[in-house]
């Protein structure tokens, strides 16, 4: 769908906010209202227990209502609380992914900071099994593991969440791109061209956007 490298802003606010002149990723896990402004390219699903059949119904309803957009990112929150039923997870996700494909939506699973989805081998196994995509969250991975993590799941990465790192549940903005440049370089190498800035403070978002724009200009 997208030809060149692009930057989008993640809406992560209970109140919801929009930039009329910027591409947006709408976070339904913050504001559950499905907003359909033209500059919204994709959505982040609410946090659901994917072991439950009710979650399939919820995700199908979201997909039905966002037809015409590009992707839906979901958390595999199984594993955060202990052992998961991988067979059930794959069965339920396969149903959701098939429905997403029929409606022209790319289903992306996101790596998390802890639990089942913090292991790149688990993420790629699920993505390969159901034939879906991956949202590569840079800040959920320690600095010294980012390149290795990406190499394991690079074939499935569709888009990326960009910020410095997550600490105590808070996404920190980069002061510069010194720590991010190695992983940004590699993301571009594998043809991941969608960088989604996932910060909550508008000033931090705009400052990071400026740095990313300058970086992409230099990369070209």
Curated annotation (Swiss-Prot):
Pfam families noted in UniProt: AP_endonuc_2
Highest taxon listed in the record's lineage: Archaea
Gene3D superfamilies with a match to the protein in the record: Divalent-metal-dependent TIM barrel enzymes
UniProt protein name: Uncharacterized protein MJ0008
Species this protein is from: Methanocaldococcus jannaschii (strain ATCC 43067 / DSM 2661 / JAL-1 / JCM 10045 / NBRC 100440) (Methanococcus jannaschii)
């Amino acid at each position: 769908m997208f030809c060149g490298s692009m930057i989008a802003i993640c809406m992560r606010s209970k109140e919801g906010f929009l930039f009329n002149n910027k591409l947006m990723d709408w976070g339904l896990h913050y504001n559950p209202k499905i907003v359909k402004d033209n500059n919204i390219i994709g959505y982040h699903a609410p946090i659901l227990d994917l072991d439950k059949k009710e979650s399939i119904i919820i995700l199908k309803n979201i997909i039905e209502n966002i037809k015409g957009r590009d992707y839906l990112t979901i958390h595999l929150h199984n594993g955060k609380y202990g052992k998961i039923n991988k067979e059930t997870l794959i069965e339920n996700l396969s149903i959701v992914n098939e429905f997403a494909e029929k409606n022209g939506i790319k289903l992306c699973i996101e790596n998390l900071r802890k639990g089942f989805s913090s292991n790149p081998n688990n993420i790629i196994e699920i993505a390969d099994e159901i034939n879906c995509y991956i949202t590569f969250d840079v800040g959920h991975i320690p600095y010294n593991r980012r390149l290795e993590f990406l190499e394991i799941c690079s074939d499935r990465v569709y888009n990326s969440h960009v910020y410095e790192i997550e600490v105590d549940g808070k996404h920190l903005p980069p002061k510069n791109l010194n720590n991010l440049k190695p992983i940004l370089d590699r993301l571009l190498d594998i043809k991941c061209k969608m960088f989604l800035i996932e910060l909550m403070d508008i000033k931090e978002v705009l400052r990071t956007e400026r740095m990313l724009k300058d970086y992409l200009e230099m990369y070209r």
